[in-house]
């Protein structure tokens, strides 16, 4: 979940990327699983899976709750996805990849689209799913391009994430 990054990181990233209008408090950051608790838990799950002859990985990421301020939808919260979510999701992936030396298998759905699917897969993250891009007007026209870009990638062994390549992708996403 993007909340693993901490409130300060996420607020700064959103502000720096021009999403300063997105309103959220630190509530979900305090209420959700903390990074310091997530890493040991994931290690235990990987160890248990290995003992059973199985593998364990993570799917990144969920949507990110933001406050409804202009009556965009009924209720109090809506959930960020798509382009705005990508820098957060790829940053979570990078941080986890570093903590696990690239040995934690990951799948991805946080803002993948025709512009970045090949970069995500080239980092050793797969499968990758897309949704938000398809919901936009004309979104289905991107399916062929997305499929072609994904198909051009060499898929490595599951659980071999390219830590440095992913770190650069995450850093670049915070300035694009």
Feature annotation, model-predicted:
Residues 1, 59-61, 107-109, 131:
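A cross-family glycoside hydrolase active-site/sugar-binding cleft signature
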Residues 1, 112-115, 135-136:
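Gly/Ser/Thr-rich loops at beta-strand to alpha-helix junctions
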